[in-house]
């Protein structure tokens, strides 16, 4: 069996494709609920309902987009066109979520208008997010079928993902310091800058990646031409940013943004200049791969879904993924309340706590990648998740003033969060190949979309219950422009439960499911050998 190794620039560009969704998702999960209750002034029950409705709409979009992307036929392939045309709406609708328009002088009436506005914008953003991110996630098995190379590719992906998450928190910290007494402007600038950086990251992947058996958007000559133009533009932004930073006594926010965007555009350009085309993406076998994928549309949608859910390892991966991301996003959505109200820390300190989680996760990502090659994905998941459960549970016991202990537990949680990024997404291509062995068809979009579908339905319910629990516990929302109120003991207890024991219990269920996951490294090698044998016979 020939090796399907990828060029470094391919891995780099592929990784950047998850940076945009990661930045926006991270900002949303850490700040949006807080923004609704403490900046827009919405009651927590109403705010939680907005998040839940948005996630339900997002979940409904996923299988539709998965099926449509599987059936898309263009010279650029099935996935890349979706990313190309969905990126600008993605950025625009993300930004619109951070505005607080005034519709009425009556606070109650205005709240209901805001409720409708945020639901419409969230629905449109989630539609654009799905159009960009779902085809992107389905690219992994299109780029390589090598077991270890896929883990390596996902390491790049989630390095950018976690790196983007950390970058978004650092950026949020700078912006918070720049506008300490103007939260409306603070979140306006945060939404705008995050949108720009995210769109550049997605376009980076879109214009560099080539799907198997398809043409790239830019040929080698155009890549070099655009690469030099982008590199020169990025260097100008970078120099202007440096100039503004070093000519200001205080931290110059626009200088920092110039440095970040300039560095990003420069790397984008360099990646295009030094790009190489992998032979396994354009040889005769790649052409056969493309022809085989074009036969999938003949299978009725209902039958495709039945085939997907008959794949038992797929159901295990769904359970593992659901447990991990429920824990991650439940914690993230409530963590800012925990830091400000339970630990009595300043809001400006929150990004550093979140960075302690994400920074540890970024470092451990490469450690787990190396270990998984030695002992397998399931064993890595067990080790990381046990550490995560211990750290998560410890948050319940912390009291105001125990800042050092908070950062230590945040780092411990980050060790586990890294396996949530790496392992479930590395398992999905193995499940897809088992389906290919059994059916002779490759349906990446179906598997990826339904994995995320169930996760989003679960998350929608969880976010709704968190919002309702805060309201039932007597949580006091802030009025726009006023100081954050002191919360009653019942609300503080609800926050502690949501940030510690609840995610830990969910993770225990994930461990139980992972114990029964059947595709080991040896089983996967056997699956690949049988697929190869079938291709040689045909």
Where are these regions (language model features)?
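Membrane-embedded alpha-helical bundles of multi-pass transporters/translocases
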Residues: 1-283, 292-538
């Amino acid at each position: 069996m020939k090796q399907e190794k990828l060029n470094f620039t391919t891995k780099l560009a592929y990784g950047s494709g998850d940076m945009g969704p990661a930045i926006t998702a991270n900002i949303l999960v850490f700040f949006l609920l807080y923004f609704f209750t403490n900046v827009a002034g919405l009651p927590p029950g109403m705010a939680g309902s907005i998040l839940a409705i948005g996630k339900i709409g997002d979940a409904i979009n996923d299988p539709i987009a998965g099926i449509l992307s599987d059936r898309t036929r263009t010279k650029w392939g099935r996935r890349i066109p979706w990313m190309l045309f969905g990126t600008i709406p993605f950025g625009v609708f993300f930004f619109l979520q951070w505005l607080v328009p005034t519709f009425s002088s009556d606070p109650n009436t205005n709240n209901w208008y805001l409720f409708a506005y945020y639901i419409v914008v969230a629905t449109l953003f989630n539609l654009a997010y799905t159009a960009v991110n779902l085809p992107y996630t389905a690219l992994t098995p299109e780029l390589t079928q090598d077991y270890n190379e896929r883990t390596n590719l996902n390491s790049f992906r989630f390095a950018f993902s976690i790196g983007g998450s950390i970058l978004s928190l650092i950026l949020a910290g700078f912006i918070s310091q720049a506008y300490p007494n103007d939260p409306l402007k603070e979140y306006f600038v945060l939404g705008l800058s995050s949108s720009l950086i995210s769109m550049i990251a997605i376009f980076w992947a879109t214009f560099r990646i080539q799907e198997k058996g398809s043409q790239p958007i830019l040929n080698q000559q155009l890549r070099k031409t655009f690469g030099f133009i982008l590199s020169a533009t990025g260097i100008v932004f970078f120099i202007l940013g440096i100039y503004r930073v070093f000519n200001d006594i205080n931290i110059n926010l626009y200088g920092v943004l110039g440095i970040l965007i300039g560095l990003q555009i420069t790397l984008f350009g360099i990646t295009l200049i030094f790009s190489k085309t992998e032979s396994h993406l354009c040889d005769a076998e790649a052409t056969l791969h493309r022809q085989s994928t074009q036969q999938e549309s003949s299978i009725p949608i209902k039958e495709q879904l039945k085939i997907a859910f008959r794949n038992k390892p797929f159901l295990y991966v769904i359970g593992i993924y659901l447990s991990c991301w429920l824990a991650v996003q439940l914690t993230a959505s409530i963590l800012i309340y925990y830091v400000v109200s339970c630990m009595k820390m300043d809001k400006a300190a929150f990004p550093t706590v979140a960075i302690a989680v994400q920074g540890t996760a970024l470092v451990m990502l490469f450690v787990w990648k190396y270990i998984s090659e030695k002992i397998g994905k399931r064993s890595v998941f067990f080790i990381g998740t046990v550490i995560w459960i211990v750290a998560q549970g410890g948050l319940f016991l912390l009291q105001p003033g125990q800042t050092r202990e908070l950062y230590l537990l945040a780092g411990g949680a980050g060790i586990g969060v890294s396996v949530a990024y790496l392992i479930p997404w590395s398992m999905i291509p193995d499940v897809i190949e088992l389906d290919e062995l059994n059916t002779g068809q490759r349906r990446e979009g179906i598997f990826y979309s339904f994995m995320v579908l169930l996760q989003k339905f679960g998350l929608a319910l969880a976010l709704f219950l968190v919002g309702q629990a805060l309201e039932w516990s007597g949580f006091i929302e802030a009025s726009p422009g006023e100081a954050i109120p002191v919360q009653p003991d019942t609300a503080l207890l609800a926050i502690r439960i949501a940030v510690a024991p609840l995610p830990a219990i969910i993770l225990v269920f994930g461990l139980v499911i992972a114990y029964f996951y059947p595709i080991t490294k040896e089983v996967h090698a056997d699956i690949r050998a049988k697929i190869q044998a079938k291709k040689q016979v045909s």
